[in-house]
Amino acid sequence: MKNLYLLLCLPFVALFFSCSTDVDLYANYREVPIIYGLLDARADTNFIKITRAFYAEGDATLSAPNPDSSNYPGKLDARLVEYCNGDSIREIILDTVTIYNKQQGVFYAPAQKLYYTTEPLPNNSKTQKYSYKLKVALPDRLLTTHADLVGNDSYDVQSLAVNFSKEYFNTVPREFLFRPAINAGFYEVDMTFTFLEQRTPDGDSVPRTMHWYIGRLNDFDLSSNMDMNCYLFYYRPEDFYAKLQEFIGGDTAIAGLKRYITDYPVEVIITAGGEELRQYVHNNDPSLGFSQGDNAFSLIDGGYGVFSSRMTARRRVRLGGETVPELVAMRNWGFKFIGGREDHQ
């Protein structure tokens, strides 16, 4: 299952072959401009990847995994035009930076040239809705694309606890509330469960975190089943136990092993993605590359890729109901509740 965490990083997914810095090697190849950018009003820096690849007539294999061919020379004129309720407010000129912590992938690594801005982006409100046009001047064309800004100050997680009590096994799913984000096309929901693990009596307690992907939820569907002014997602307690059993390695008791549960062990993470991103994910299989035969979906006028927006809401919550005593009762799992205490001896 595709996780939004990966989608929101959005590497250009395609098949590549070796290439040389010799430009003549690309004489028979057509240049493909590519843009990936997701604006986030809660981020202190927003990055946009502006790059290119090459392919030949009838050849679905793209080339350009090294910086000499993938990067456009110099610094392009790239800017964001900010709109409020449809009126142009300001232009933000993007600067460039090279990052050196990119993991190995289809593009060259570890260094990547990115365009960025540290200009604060305003939040949407009931009376003011923001959007952005990205304009990139290439030597032979102008790339343009548009995105509505996702999110607002009130977008957040509402419920204060999750309840994995066994009395709800194989019954109706449990519900969890959050406030919607303006201009969101969909949401992806994750939970994490963190506990301390001590494998020997004199050993250190090491944090361990189980990640649980709940799913992708369409804004249109959520809006048709609201609780007051909140959206709801659902989870099943039996799925939590199954995930946790797999994560800790089964039911077999390990001599001397202890696991400690604190007051707020679960974090709920809800990421809202823009409508442009929803359309891109819906229309493109990220495992495929672009070719003339693919007719790949793109909202970039003059290029490929996606330009959209996102915002993440998160909250640490308690374990409700009988969840804690029931976990402690699973003796082979070795759990003990310590609340907010640092001393768990």
What are these regions (language model features)?
Residues 6-10:
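Sec-dependent N-terminal signal peptides
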Residues 15-18:
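C-terminal motif of bacterial Sec signal peptides marking the signal peptidase cleavage site
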Residues 1-4, 21:
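Positively charged n-region of N-terminal signal peptides that target proteins for export
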Residues 20-345:
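A sequence/structural signal for flexible, mid-protein segments enriched
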